[in-house]
From Swiss-Prot:
UniProt keyword list: Ribonucleoprotein, Ribosomal protein, RNA-binding, rRNA-binding
GO MF annotations, alphabetized: rRNA binding; structural constituent of ribosome
Annotated function: This protein binds to 23S rRNA in the presence of protein L20.
Coiled coil (residue ranges): none
Protein name: Large ribosomal subunit protein bL21
Gene: rplU
């Protein structure tokens, strides 16, 4: 059974036991989190969400991705700007899909 959930402005297809990375959620490691914004399951399609459906996941860890470098440059104008960014994420493992 699979489900499509909406979190952090993105849509993610999940199955039971799958590990997923999503945008940072305000929960601690070891807690459980319920996604109620379920767009579809293997047998139902929501309009926009499936009524009574939820996906329960356990938080594995909070972390930050690799650093990416943003470099702005204009030739002949002595304009250079270098900036780094690390995106925060939450790693989850899907425990159950209901509905």
């Amino acid at each position: 059974m699979f489900a499509i959930i909406q979190t952090g402005g993105k849509q993610v297809k999940v199955t039971e036991g799958q590990e997923i990375y999503v945008e940072k959620l305000d929960v601690e490691a070891g807690d459980t989190f319920e996604f109620t914004e379920v767009l579809a399951t293997s047998d139902k399609i929501g309009h926009p969400y499936v009524e009574g459906a939820k996906v329960v996941a356990e938080v594995i860890k909070q972390g930050r991705q690799r650093k990416i470098i943003v470099f702005k440059y204009k030739r002949r104008k002595n304009y250079r700007r270098k900036q780094g960014h690390r995106q925060a994420y939450t790693k989850l493992v899907v425990k159950s899909i209901q509905g």
